[in-house]
Amino acid sequence: MTEEAVALLRTIPLFRQMGLAELYLLTGIGMEEQVPAGTTLGVENEPVTDLWVILEGRVRITSPATGEGESFLEGPAVWGAAALVEPHTSFGTGVTATECRMLRIPAVDLRELAVRNPRLGVRLYQEFATHIFVRLQRLIEESASRNAGRPTSQAPRPARPAARRRDIPELHSPPADALSLLQRVPVLEHLQPDQLRLLFAIGVERHLAPGTLLGRGGEPLDVLWIILEGEVEIDSPLTRGSSIIAGPESWGTASLVPPHTPNGTAVTVTECRALLLRAEDVRALIEQSPRLGVDLYLALSTNVFRRIRVLTDAAGRPLR
């Protein structure tokens, strides 16, 4: 791989946090190829076996499942990043529109490299999580735009007293069942028991009264809430509706990726037992334990993919 090709990699957002040595590790598991025009790189809703790094050339992407139609990727760019997370299926069909100079990286090898070299892995998955969060935000906004002016299917709810933050005494003795509850939180599903203990150690367990505000949609958020027990209502002006999440669950993962703003406002409905994690403390822990960061951002991205599936299914379109 030439220095010029590595320099092109550094301009791609997915790799922008990586140092030169990490980029050479990445290119070491890939193969540079000249790909003829008209070559199918992957088909929507089918397994993605390779991450294609487009160094030069143009790729046509069709994404009927989300209503995004046809678009083009101009090198330097990547196609096939869905290979990074389960279920490893394509977000659209990619076909080269011109002859392309590409680096083909086997997806299995890339995922294994992220585990073997966790500092590389955490930078890769953090950027990917940011990308997929932006994609989810766009889909939510498009869904809201399509539904503008339509009546909601929800019955009116009685007025609720204004939510406010409450001063809750911190609990310094974690209950014995806390780790077993953490293991059931979807965004923590890839973490091992020792990693969960590290995470618990930097958090503060709280008992929250009904009506406690956890965060407002569209406003900066600097905490991640792990709801161990209880229910939280999420109101989203974009979707013109609300939903209830019940522990063990999480809210506030947006605090871990730019722009650090959640889509909805979260308020406790019942008394809740929760673990408060400050985003800056989580990031500091990831710096000390990058493998934890790989597993956390991997689970976070996987859960965002699931939300995208729900949105596309609700819109009555097949999932790509």
Where are the regions that the model predicts?
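Cytosolic regulatory regions built on CNB/CRP/Popeye-like sensor folds
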Residues: 1-320
